[in-house]
Amino acid sequence: MPELPQVPLTLEGSNVLHQIFRFDWTAWKKLPLDERTAISAEFSALLARWEAGNTEPNGHPNQSALFSQIGHKGDLILIHFRDSLEDLNRVELELAQTSLYPFLQQTSSYLSVVELGLYESSEKIYAQLAEKGLEPGTPEWNAGAGEATARTFASLSSRLFPAIPPAKYLCFYPMDRKRGEQVNWYTEPMADRRTMMHERQIITGSIGLDDWEWGVDLFADDPIIFKKLIYEMRFDKVSAVYASFGQFFLSVRVHAANINQWFDGTLA
């Protein structure tokens, strides 16, 4: 029996872009009312189209959502789910052509892809391939692994290409797995990592795409849920020992139909 790989198989779905902006309120308030109204209407129409996403039967949702950032880290967060990086780039360029764009200063962004780690399935698939006499890394091995994951991919399509939840609040944060001298997530045996990963779920992977390894989006109608969930995670071994967390961004949903309220400072 050859030594089995320690790298779990993963499934990838929607490409995800977070854009964080500051809004130039000083310049905005200097505009005549009719110009502000026209710019607001233009952006509202664009956002409504992005919110609706793909309406074709059997297509991926491919939606976007706007959130009003709470605190000093920014004013607005746009989240985009799309099938490809090219589609995300088209969204960026489309936004750049709007009359609203000169009032937006992008302070940060985060690029990732929806990821499901197949820890338990990987061990079974690797064992089955080894029993057939296949060697890890060979074309036959890779083809066998691809066939096995393709079946799982089809059954998990709704999780890999999700619609944006309609919840009122968003909590977004990036995170890494520790690789210190005494604690290194990646040197733990895959069976041990699988056991620990049952305690939480990573939503989007960004290794090779952005500065952190994963990005996590939490949606809820009660923001206290975020506090309770993250506090509970502190007691999970996978988080307490191996996780490094980045900044947390908390925001409130702004629908296209309510964008005028946001511009007027009356968002409920």
What does each model-found stretch correspond to?
Residues 19, 69-84, 170-175, 210-233:
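Short, well-ordered beta-strand segments in beta-rich or mixed alpha/beta enzyme
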Residues 84-87, 98-101, 195:
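Secondary-structure boundary elements
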Residues 90-97, 228-234:
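Short amphipathic alpha-helices in soluble, non-transmembrane regions
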